[in-house]
Amino acid sequence: MTAFTATVTVRLKRGVLDPEAETTQRSLERLGFELDDLRSADRFEIDLDAETADDAAERAEEMAERLLANPTIHDYDVEVAERE
Protein backbone atom coordinates (compact mmCIF):
# COMPACT_ATOMS: atom_id res chain seq x y z
CA MET A 1 0.00 0.00 0.00
CA THR A 2 1.08 3.55 -0.69
CA ALA A 3 0.20 6.64 1.35
CA PHE A 4 -1.77 9.30 -0.53
CA THR A 5 -3.45 12.60 0.23
CA ALA A 6 -6.68 13.22 -1.66
CA THR A 7 -7.83 16.82 -1.81
CA VAL A 8 -11.56 17.24 -2.43
CA THR A 9 -12.73 20.77 -3.26
CA VAL A 10 -16.50 21.27 -3.00
CA ARG A 11 -18.19 24.41 -4.34
CA LEU A 12 -21.71 25.48 -5.15
CA LYS A 13 -22.72 25.09 -8.79
CA ARG A 14 -22.96 28.26 -10.84
CA GLY A 15 -26.40 29.77 -10.41
CA VAL A 16 -26.85 28.49 -6.84
CA LEU A 17 -27.10 31.34 -4.33
CA ASP A 18 -23.78 31.77 -2.48
CA PRO A 19 -24.35 34.43 0.22
CA GLU A 20 -20.88 33.97 1.73
CA ALA A 21 -19.21 34.69 -1.61
CA GLU A 22 -21.52 37.63 -2.34
CA THR A 23 -20.71 39.27 1.00
CA THR A 24 -16.99 38.67 0.55
CA GLN A 25 -17.06 40.02 -3.00
CA ARG A 26 -18.82 43.21 -1.89
CA SER A 27 -16.27 43.69 0.89
CA LEU A 28 -13.35 43.18 -1.48
CA GLU A 29 -14.85 45.67 -3.94
CA ARG A 30 -15.26 48.23 -1.12
CA LEU A 31 -11.54 47.75 -0.43
CA GLY A 32 -10.81 48.68 -4.05
CA PHE A 33 -10.36 45.22 -5.58
CA GLU A 34 -11.95 44.68 -8.99
CA LEU A 35 -13.45 41.22 -9.52
CA ASP A 36 -15.67 39.62 -12.10
CA ASP A 37 -16.94 36.90 -9.78
CA LEU A 38 -16.15 35.11 -6.53
CA ARG A 39 -17.23 31.69 -5.31
CA SER A 40 -16.60 30.10 -1.95
CA ALA A 41 -15.46 26.49 -1.57
CA ASP A 42 -14.76 23.89 1.08
CA ARG A 43 -11.55 21.88 0.87
CA PHE A 44 -11.09 18.47 2.47
CA GLU A 45 -7.66 16.83 2.72
CA ILE A 46 -7.96 13.08 3.22
CA ASP A 47 -4.95 10.93 4.08
CA LEU A 48 -5.43 7.33 2.97
CA ASP A 49 -3.55 4.23 1.89
CA ALA A 50 -4.28 2.64 -1.48
CA GLU A 51 -2.65 0.38 -4.05
CA THR A 52 -2.56 3.11 -6.73
CA ALA A 53 -3.35 6.80 -7.17
CA ASP A 54 -6.39 5.78 -9.24
CA ASP A 55 -7.67 3.65 -6.33
CA ALA A 56 -7.17 6.58 -3.94
CA ALA A 57 -9.01 8.91 -6.32
CA GLU A 58 -11.86 6.43 -6.69
CA ARG A 59 -12.28 6.21 -2.91
CA ALA A 60 -12.17 10.01 -2.55
CA GLU A 61 -14.77 10.35 -5.34
CA GLU A 62 -17.04 7.95 -3.48
CA MET A 63 -16.61 9.96 -0.26
CA ALA A 64 -17.50 13.14 -2.13
CA GLU A 65 -20.56 11.60 -3.77
CA ARG A 66 -21.85 9.95 -0.59
CA LEU A 67 -21.18 12.66 1.99
CA LEU A 68 -18.95 15.62 1.20
CA ALA A 69 -20.98 17.05 -1.69
CA ASN A 70 -24.65 17.25 -2.57
CA PRO A 71 -24.66 16.59 -6.34
CA THR A 72 -27.84 18.63 -6.75
CA ILE A 73 -26.15 21.88 -5.70
CA HIS A 74 -22.40 21.16 -5.59
CA ASP A 75 -19.58 20.56 -8.02
CA TYR A 76 -16.40 18.96 -6.73
CA ASP A 77 -12.86 18.20 -7.84
CA VAL A 78 -10.56 15.47 -6.57
CA GLU A 79 -6.77 15.67 -6.71
CA VAL A 80 -4.50 12.92 -5.40
CA ALA A 81 -0.82 13.14 -4.50
CA GLU A 82 1.51 10.59 -3.00
CA ARG A 83 2.47 11.40 0.58
CA GLU A 84 6.13 11.39 1.49
What are these regions (language model features)?
Residues M1-E84:
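Long, contiguous binding/interaction regions
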